[in-house]
Amino acid sequence: MNIKFINISTNGIGIVFSMMLMLFFIVPKSAAQELEAKININHNQIQGTDASIFDNLQQTLEQFVNERQWTNLKFQKNERIQCSFNVTVTKYDKNTNTFTCKAQVQANRPVYNSAYTTTLYNNVDNDFTFQFAQFDQLEFNEENIDNQLTALFAYYAYLIIGINLDSFAPMG
């Protein structure tokens, strides 16, 4: 990478621009995402369907949950909230791309001054139904809920973040 410095005497703005470019390339970006979710899609009950749809769903959901910044808070990588979503597909309609599932959602946090973690949240959701077509891109808009899948995961993401924050201090 070649960085060209601009002569200060001819262009005072050039030095500011050059310094900003240097900071952009030198200063590491901090992680802003709050969650580190593991998502498991169990599709053993579904026969005769290409397994790639379930693999794609798992990868897409992990990317959606882990790479989205859910709040304005800044979390370092080691501060991210550990959580898991174990989704068991009980029925899949490939004509409508409808998944009927049950899900176990769990979140943990470290115990102060120890190497242990404790469970913050553990729930089984027996009515976890959504539509997903292979290679769908998941977009979430807080002001307009138009996708049941993103709404479900956003609900649990915000719930987990809120419970985690309350575990450190009342009202986060």
Where are the model-predicted features located?
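Membrane-targeting and insertion segments and their boundary/processing signals
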Residues: 31-35, 55, 123-131
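Acidic/His-rich structured neighborhood in mature extracellular/periplasmic domains
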Residues: 100-172
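Start-of-domain marker
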Residues: 33-100, 111-113
